[in-house]
Amino acid sequence: MADMDFNDRTVLVTGAARGLGKQIARAFHALGARVALNDLKGDAIAAAIADLGAGPRLAAAEADISTAAGCENAVRATLERYDRLDVLVNNAAVNWEMPIAAHTEEIWDKHVDTILKGSFFCAKAAIPALKDSRGNIVNIASELGLHPIVSNVAYCAAKGGVVNLTRALAIELAPDIRVNCIAPGAMDTELMRDCAAASGDAAAYYRYYQNFNPLKRIARPEEVAETVVFVASAAAAFVTGAIIPVDGGSIAGRL
């Protein structure tokens, strides 16, 4: 399908060394895109690039996107390598599940800075290049940004912020730049495995999330990545400001 062709297009994915971000990079690369992978550590990016097949259409954009300067560095690295930017995917995230009483200022700031602040300042840094290409932004929120759960306040708050950030960016950046948001449900990624291990009962953790939605299973990251690619493609040219759950019906079951 021509509308899903990303040949001669450049995509920057934050938090791309593992998990959903890596699958998003894989999906765009398979459709012909040049993909810049951002993450904190260069060796982790290099390993991801090797796993994706290496080659001239894959590049590192190492930076700490929890700071405005880091966001600028990630965008700059992409433009220095490929001289254009067509799609920004704000995917980077952290998640430490704990009750309110256990939250420190450092933990709160790490969630908000990585998830919400990073999404805003990456978008801000990318605006000139995206205007030139009439490109678009895809923010990765979460079903928990739409219906929170207990013992996850900082993550839920930051992801909820991404939802409204998407809408605010969409109305201000139109008509030149589209901005949309994917709100995934629980996915079988390294981040989820880390959370399961930290819970003290990984089997119970997985059972909880498997029963969280009507489909009674956890998503595969490639299922979410395919939705990201669609929203970023010409097939979704009339879609902006949308919040799209990819959650197995979890939110519908809570309306």
Residue ranges of model-derived segments:
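Active-site helix of classical SDR
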Residues: A123, A158, T166
